[in-house]
């Protein structure tokens, strides 16, 4: 494999470098461009010939060059949401946010010291998130997770239940170590 560091002509910026690059095959030029982009260097100053198949009908074409945009898109991988919402929870949140008194407000999920087991979920509507709060967007709904609750809530699933006695949000949290008898409070793994 051709390495750009093994060729002395590529280390200097001179006319000799351009002459050397013009003598390279198309495959070698594409390899050099890929190496330079991968290593974070600027692209090479050489024009790549068109990649049309020859008229002789050889049928082989050079590989497609990797663009700077493709390299940049692999540097940052999308993150998973801190909390997932079930379709019932999304539907109920949309109904709540469509009411006149809740326009422009978002639900903020937090954890506070309360109950037999030590911690309980707190839900409140706010207009503006705090500086380090996490905003979760799913199915057209935006909710906020308080920064102090991120470690306790991460990986949870939020559901909505409406039965004969009560209607409430239910959290399925993989970080819970134990819950109290009534189910209102919990303790997490440390």
From Swiss-Prot:
Residues 49-71 are annotated as: Disordered. Signal peptide: none annotated. It is found in: Mitochondrion matrix. GO terms for biological process: [4Fe-4S] cluster assembly; iron-sulfur cluster assembly. Fe cation binds at residues 116, 180, 182. It comes from the Eukaryota. The keyword Metal-binding applies. GO terms for cellular component: cytoplasm; mitochondrial [4Fe-4S] assembly complex; mitochondrial matrix; mitochondrion. Keywords: Iron, Metal-binding, Mitochondrion. Disulfide bonds: none annotated. GO terms for molecular function: 2 iron, 2 sulfur cluster binding; iron-sulfur cluster binding; iron-sulfur transferase activity; metal ion binding. InterPro entries: Fe-S_cluster_asmbl/transfer, FeS_biogenesis, FeS_cluster_insertion, FeS_cluster_insertion_CS, HesB-like_dom_sf. Involved in the assembly of mitochondrial and cytoplasmic iron-sulfur proteins. Probably involved in the binding of an intermediate of Fe/S cluster assembly. Belongs to the HesB/IscA family. This is Iron-sulfur assembly protein 1. The gene is isa1.
């Amino acid at each position: 494999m051709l390495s750009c560091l093994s060729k002395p002509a590529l280390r200097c910026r001179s006319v000799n470098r351009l002459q050397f690059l013009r003598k390279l095959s198309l495959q070698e030029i594409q390899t050099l461009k890929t190496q330079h982009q991968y290593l974070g260097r600027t692209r090479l100053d050489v024009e790549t010939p068109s990649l049309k198949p020859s008229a002789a009908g050889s049928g082989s074409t050079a590989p497609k060059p990797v663009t700077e945009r493709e390299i940049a898109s692999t540097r940052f991988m999308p993150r998973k949401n801190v909390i997932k919402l079930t379709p019932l929870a999304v539907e109920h949140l949309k109904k709540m946010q469509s009411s006149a008194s809740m326009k422009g407000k978002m639900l903020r999920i937090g954890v506070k010291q309360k109950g037999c087991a030590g911690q309980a979920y707190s839900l409140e509507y706010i207009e503006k998130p705090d500086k380090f709060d996490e905003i979760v967007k799913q199915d057209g709904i935006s909710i906020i997770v308080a920064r102090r609750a991120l470690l306790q809530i991460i990986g949870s699933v939020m559901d909505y239940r409406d039965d004969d006695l009560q209607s409430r949000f239910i959290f399925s949290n993989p970080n819970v170590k134990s819950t109290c008898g009534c189910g209102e409070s919990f303790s997490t793994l440390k």
